[in-house]
Amino acid sequence: MGKIRKLDDQLSNKIAAGEVVERPASVVKELVENAVDANSTIIEIELEEAGLTKIRVIDNGDGMEEDDCLVAFERHATSKIKDEHDLFRIRTLGFRGEALPSIASVSEVEMKTSTGDGPGTKVVLKGGKLVVHERTTSRKGTDITVSNLFFNTPARLKYMKTIHTELGHVTDVVNRLAMAHPDISFRLRHHGKQLLYTSGNGDVRHVLAAIYGMDVAKKMIPIQAESLDFTVQGYISLPEVTRASRNYISTIVNGRYVRNIPLAKAIEAGYHTLLPIGRYPIVFLSIAMDPILVDVNVHPAKLEVRFSKEAELNELVTQAIRQALQARTLIPEMMIKQKETPKPKAEQTAWTFEHVVKEPFVSPLVHVDEPKQVDEPKQSSPVQEPKEEIPSFLPTVESKQNDVDDELVEMDEQTESSDEQEHVNDRLPPLYPIGQMHGTYILAQNERGLYIIDQHAAQERIKYEYFREKVGEVINEVQELLVPLTFHYPTDEYVLIDAHREELAKCGVFLEPFGHNTFIVRSHPSWFPKGEEAEIIEEMIQQVIDMKKVDMKQLREKAAILMSCKRSIKANEYLRDDEIFALLESLRKTTDPFTCPHGRPIIIHFSTYELEKMFKRVM
């Protein structure tokens, strides 16, 4: 008898579950995506023990007929695609037909579903085996409960993380689905406590406010770009709002949350020199394209995708972000935190919106009532919204009107006023120096308030933009060295450097072989920082050694940043009045006067009104 045998369906489903059902968050993702594909407008998720004990997903979607109920738990059974042609034009979130049988094989599943046209159907499966099949109520939609996850695979259960960690993964999944589908109302509860509520009014800004909070949402600006193949729109945070990981970058392709490293790098490239090292923006991008241009059938989890025109898409995204940021004044506003009145807890509050604000919003300012003593822009009166009753399939507390709509209306008005001002003034308004603090910070003022400028960061930005233009230019003027510089390297490094002498020469480093494993430099461009020649050349050579593949654009960029750091004004260096004036004027002429090349802020602003509040001149 042969050694090779065909595995039975139950064992095959358990093996498939190893890829599809990694943790409770995987189950939530698959069930909620099914609800989205079923044209639901309200989706409720209830958890116990972060989903390990119980996951319940209720929707008001199309539901299933009795025959489909049983077939749905068979492997590779799906209503999403019919033939090979459909596989290359996928418009639904699910399509593989693996999720339900995989989930059922490692848990206990109870599903009630109905199309609303007749009696519903109830099925119960344990470990993939059908134990109950009967008629039930006819409420349209699906109510599916997954209990005792991994009860028959204890090895998998043993490797689950803490409840807090697993709950974090579930929340992350639901948050991204909510951002991808702002027209659906999502409600997430854990042991009855509400963790997320979105109104489903179609405005993604409301979803961003629900997830990240109003303070962050108010510091996110809209972006939009379009090409022949792609449409990109979304919201990006101002450079002053950052996080320590890329996990806050959400990219949605045709309604599906995806991970794509080149796309994430394209987003970061749009913030070039605007963010400190190790800090990342908060980004929501929704990208629409012909399904044939993206392959979502790369991994069973359907998170990783491949694009047919990846370079074109990445360039479009980078330029869209860059243009949106270049149109803004990126000076961080220093705000005085107000004492807030106690607010209802998350589980006691639901948001209802009927009015949808469609204009883009941008405002780094927190709303404050206008005091009579200070001439501030007039604020709009609160918009009174009629309450909208939202049906719920589970017992919920009474919904209360939230002030998010009012704040978004206000932000739109502030944006219009700000945009008008942008056309009148440069990105950095004229500043009038009034002093220097600790030989490190320049104090300046204008009619808008007080500005504090980091003098070292300011000169770094000025020099960086100067050297960025110089590095890579045709070098006509060179400075001969009175004493040539020599550099000795091990054989492996010498061979590597010698292979890239042409690229180094384009950056102003003129190397000539000079004996065994040695190079000599006899001249350099006239714009090289004086007194720093040896150190700069050595560090430029080191960049080539460290690069796995020498990229000229990246090499020039590193050269410009390196040179901008040399001989810039340092801390504890006192400047004359004329030097301060010259520095500020030079800063105004730069393209990005708000951060140094390393992403640190150059300037911060205290408005006159905020200063008045500090001294209790206004209340």
Swiss-Prot record:
Highest taxon of the lineage: Bacteria
Molecular function per GO: ATP binding; ATP hydrolysis activity; ATP-dependent DNA damage sensor activity; mismatched DNA binding
Gene3D superfamilies the record matches: 3.30.230.10, Histidine kinase-like ATPase, C-terminal domain, MutL, C-terminal domain, dimerisation subdomain, MutL, C-terminal domain, regulatory subdomain
Biological processes, Gene Ontology terms: mismatch repair
GO CC aspect terms: mismatch repair complex
Region (Disordered): 368-403
Keywords: DNA damage, DNA repair
Bias-annotated ranges (Basic and acidic residues): 368-378
Keyword hit for DNA damage: yes
SMART domains, per the entry: DNA_mis_repair (SM01340), MutL_C (SM00853)
Any single Pfam family the record assigns to this protein: HATPase_c_3
Record has Protein biosynthesis as a keyword: no
Function statement: This protein is involved in the repair of mismatches in DNA. It is required for dam-dependent methyl-directed DNA mismatch repair. May act as a 'molecular matchmaker', a protein that promotes the formation of a stable complex between two or more DNA-binding proteins in an ATP-dependent manner without itself being part of a final effector complex.
Family, similarity comment: Belongs to the DNA mismatch repair MutL/HexB family.
Protein's name according to its UniProt entry: DNA mismatch repair protein MutL
Lineage: Bacteria, Bacillati, Bacillota, Bacilli, Bacillales
Gene expressing this chain: mutL
